[in-house]
Amino acid sequence: PTKPNPLGLKCFVLAAPDGLVLDFHFYTGKDTVSDADMKELGLGASVVKLLCESVPQNNMHCIYTDRFFTSIKSLDYLLERNTYQTGTVMKNRIGRVIDKLKTDTQLKRGEWDEKVREDEKVCGVTWKDNKSVLLLSSCVGSEPVTTCKRWSKEEKKKVTIPQPMVVNLYNEKMGGVDLGDRFMILNICYIHTC
C-alpha cells in the first residue's frame, strides 16, 4: 500500500537523475542473479552488479542507491570498477568497518558523525534531521557542509540547519527511477485484444 505501484512485475532499474532509464532487469525469482553472486554479495549488491555491467568502467561514475542496494560489499565491488556508490544503508549492513557512529539519541538536529574506513575509500555518515539517516559513500564525505531549510515546531517557521555534502548530493541525485515511472505512466499505450 505504501509503494507507488504495488501490482505488476518487479523490475530493477538503473536511471539517470532526470528519469532516463539506462538499464533494467525483471525479477525472475531465484534466477535473477547467479548463485555465486548471491552467496558472495547478497541480493541487493548482486542486482547492483548486474545493472552496472552496462556502465562503462573507469569513467568514475557515482551510483546512488536506496537502503536495499547499499552495502560494504556493493561499494567494494564498484570500487574495483572505478565506479562509486552513495546510498542510505541499514545498520546491519555497515559491518565492523564503520560501526562506531553516533546513534540517534546522541545527535541533535543538524548534527552528524562521520567515520572513514582505514583504507580511506569508504565513509559512513549519520546525520540527524527529524530522525537520523545513515549513509555509506565511496565518492563524497560530509565536507563541504551545505545548509537546508527545515520546519521547526518550536519556532513555527523554517530554519536553516547544516547538512553534510553526502546527504545533499543523495537528495539531489536520487529519484530518477520514480521520475521514470511517472514518465511511463503519462505515456501508457493500451493494447486491446479481440
What are these regions (language model features)?
Residues P1-C194:
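Acidic, contiguous segments within the catalytic cores of piggyBac-derived transposases
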